[in-house]
């Protein structure tokens, strides 16, 4: 009987909390992040272990480039649900952004944790595409002396190829573009277009022509082809 009474006493609060969450989520999707943050913070005061609320607050902090706050939210998520791959991926992402934008000497000490977070995401979810993209970016951006490796980037690109052909071609093209193998990158981006016809594939090829190969007319034609295809 007591449990029934407690349930009916708590029911209005539960409905209110869900209503507020829905409002916060709607504001987030509308990119009204400051307003959404206020709502999610109020929810967190009464429900400090609500995973989705914490994740939204982490996402908002990341968009605001408040790296320490975002790190704190994602770290809490890892503690509350240690087998969720995406929390490790997001944690590694904001930790990496803090490293890039902060003290370079401190950044060196963060590299292993960034890499380890992405690797953990893949270990928990072997089909995690975004974590592989993040590792590719990490390995091509880092100097060799602190762990950068083109061959390791290619390894993760090969893994992407098995999971998603378009991601495989785009990632290989990205690696080729980074190392100034523009003709090879062009081939990969064209393969991505052929199998997916995605906006991203067309945009990558157009950007390559315009920004790296000094062929603005080719870039224009690529974007026009995409526009005509969608029209």
Question: Model regions: which residues?
Answer:
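Canonical tetratricopeptide repeat
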Residues: 52, 56-59, 90, 134, ...
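A structural motif in tetratricopeptide-repeat
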Residues: 47, 81, 118, 125, ...
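Structural motif corresponding to the intra-repeat A-B loop/turn of tetratricopeptide repeats
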Residues: 30, 64, 98, 142, ...
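Residue-level recognition of tetratricopeptide repeat
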Residues: 50, 84, 128, 165-167, ...
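Residue at a conserved register position within TPR or TPR-like alpha-solenoid repeats
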Residues: 27, 61, 95, 102, ...
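N-terminal leader/linker segments that initiate helical-solenoid repeat arrays
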Residues: 15-56, 62-63
């Amino acid at each position: 009987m007591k449990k029934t009474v407690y349930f009916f006493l708590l029911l209005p609060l539960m409905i209110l909390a869900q209503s507020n969450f829905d409002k916060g989520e709607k504001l987030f999707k509308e990119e009204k992040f400051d307003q959404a943050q206020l709502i999610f913070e109020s929810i967190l005061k009464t429900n400090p272990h609500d995973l989705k609320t914490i994740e939204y607050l982490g996402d908002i902090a990341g968009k605001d480039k408040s790296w320490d706050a975002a790190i704190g939210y994602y770290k809490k998520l890892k503690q509350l649900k240690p087998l969720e791959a995406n929390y490790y991926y997001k944690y590694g992402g904001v930790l990496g952004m803090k490293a890039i934008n902060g003290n370079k000497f401190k950044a060196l000490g963060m590299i292993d944790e960034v890499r380890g977070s992405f690797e953990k995401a893949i270990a928990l979810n072997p089909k995690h595409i975004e974590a592989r993209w993040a590792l590719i970016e990490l390995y091509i951006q880092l100097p060799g002396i602190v762990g950068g490796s083109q061959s390791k980037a290619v390894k993760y690109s090969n893994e992407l190829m098995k999971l998603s052909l378009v991601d495989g071609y785009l990632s290989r093209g990205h690696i080729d573009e980074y190392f100034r193998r523009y003709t090879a990158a062009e081939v990969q981006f064209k393969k991505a277009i052929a199998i997916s016809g995605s906006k991203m594939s067309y945009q990558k090829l157009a950007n390559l022509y315009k920004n790296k190969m000094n062929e603005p007319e080719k870039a224009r034609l690529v974007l026009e082809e995409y526009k005509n295809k969608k029209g």
